[in-house]
Swiss-Prot record:
GO terms of biological process kind: intracellular protein transmembrane transport; protein transport by the Tat complex
Name used for this protein in its record: Sec-independent protein translocase protein TatC
Organism name: Rothia mucilaginosa (strain DY-18) (Stomatococcus mucilaginosus)
Domain of life: Bacteria
Family: Belongs to the TatC family.
Membrane topology: Multi-pass membrane protein
Subunit structure: The Tat system comprises two distinct complexes: a TatABC complex, containing multiple copies of TatA, TatB and TatC subunits, and a separate TatA complex, containing only TatA subunits. Substrates initially bind to the TatABC complex, which probably triggers association of the separate TatA complex to form the active translocon.
Stretches of the chain forming a coiled coil according to its record: none
Length: 293
């Protein structure tokens, strides 16, 4: 019985080779198992070595509010099993992040044999741009998160304490980072849609007001602080990414228009250099005109 790697090698040797549905499903299952094993190993490593630094990092704004304002803000684990539950939850998320290269590698090994060279080039370009955009979103959210938490905690009344449920707080942190980071991928998706010819850059540019409104809503949802400057700090990089994507779309449109113009010009020249057949001349009435003359 052929293994998935043997199937891939066979398809490299013979690009026109076809796999049965059962073989596709077996290869998909094996690659999914490999990615899952990598995630479990990465989750164990993340739980042992990275869980405590992660908790210290997200607790830093709470300690800052304690020192600067006198308001008490602490994480609260509401049950006996809650610390262990949060340990597993955070460890799994860390494992998914660490093992993401393995997931990506297994997905590519499964998909690439079915793609042509040009499609592979587009896929690698899209993945590279998406990873870069997502990483930028993670970095920006990492630096802005303490300010967001600090601004929200300042609403705690004076001489009152804020005992935050650990599960709710960790979920808030994860949603903030993931939502803001995914927002950076939207411009990459716009470029991908433009490359497919489904939308033109000028069409997106005409809707620039809606783009600004969308970015403002995303910034307001991910940074609901009392300081309006925090919202503008988050809006700035998103707007730069969006308008850079629009510029790339317009450049791609001009390149595509030039290619289409050359193809049209070439077809016109070919038609001029081709002699008209006798059948076409007969349809045009050329021979009848000769007889009457």
């Amino acid at each position: 019985m052929a293994t998935p790697d043997q199937d891939v090698r066979n398809r490299k040797i013979n690009p026109e080779a076809r796999m049965e549905l059962k073989e596709h499903l077996r290869e998909f299952r094996d690659r999914l198992i490999k990615a899952a094993i990598a995630t479990i190993i990465a989750a164990i490593i993340g739980t042992v070595f990275l869980y405590q630094p992660f908790i210290e990092m997200i607790s830093a704004p709470l300690q800052q509010i304690n020192i600067e304002t006198g308001r008490r803000a602490n994480l609260n684990y509401g049950s006996v099993a809650s610390p262990f539950d949060q340990l597993l939850k955070v460890g799994m998320y860390i494992g998914l992040v660490i093992a993401s290269p393995v997931w990506l590698y297994q997905a590519l090994r499964f998909l690439l044999p079915a793609l042509h060279t040009k499609e592979k080039k587009y896929l690698f370009g899209f993945l590279t741009a998406s990873i870069f955009a997502f990483a930028c979103g993670v970095a920006i959210s990492y630096f802005t998160l303490p300010g967001v938490v600090y601004a929200l905690l300042k609403f705690t009344p004076v001489n009152e304490s804020n005992y935050i449920d650990a599960g709710v707080y960790i979920s808030f942190i994860l949603k903030f980072v993931v939502t803001f980071s995914c927002a950076f991928i939207i411009p990459v998706i716009l470029v991908g849609i433009n490359m497919l010819g489904l939308i033109r850059g000028k069409t997106i540019l005409k809707s620039w007001r809606w783009v600004v409104v969308l970015v403002a809503v995303i910034a307001a949802l991910t940074a609901p602080g009392s300081d309006i400057m925090m919202m503008f700090v988050l809006m700035a990089p998103l707007l730069i990414f969006f308008f850079a994507a629009i510029g790339i779309c317009m450049i791609n449109d001009k390149r595509r228009d030039r290619k289409l113009a050359k193809l049209a010009q070439g077809s016109d020249e070919a038609s001029l250099n081709t002699a008209t057949s006798s059948e076409d001349l007969a349809k045009m009435g050329y021979f009848e005109e000769e007889k009457t003359s």
